Amino acid sequence: MSTKIILVVDDDLTHLKLMRKLLGKLGHIVVTTDSAEEAEHILRYEEHFSLIITDLRMPWLNGLDFCRRMKILKPDLKIYALSGWVYNFGMNELEDAGFDGIYQKPISKANLEEILNADI
């Protein structure tokens, strides 16, 4: 598996640390942020990312709206929803937002590998 540059967006700092550790151990470069607004800034002006893993329920800009905006800005970028609140949203709403995959927290190792191997 090639090294990926992954942006993880979640307002839960404990989850960000966990994802950084898990993905880092798998040999990937991980950038984390606790807000979709900052993530949008990073994507507009900074690095090239292989994929994004984002929470859905965040203050100010939620994961749905963040995904919609990023798919306009970077339509080929893979964006995955990872949330403890997946079932609070309609699947059509999530798919229409443009997510490439939707996963429930806590993510299993198999699902994480599915995300990482999706674009090989």
Predicted regions and their residues:
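Receiver (REC) domain active-site loop signature in two-component systems and cognate sites
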Residues: 58
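Active-site beta3 strand of CheY-like receiver
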Residues: 47-53
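As written
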Residues: 63, 95-100
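Two-component/phosphorelay signaling modules centered on CheY-like receiver
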Residues: 13-31
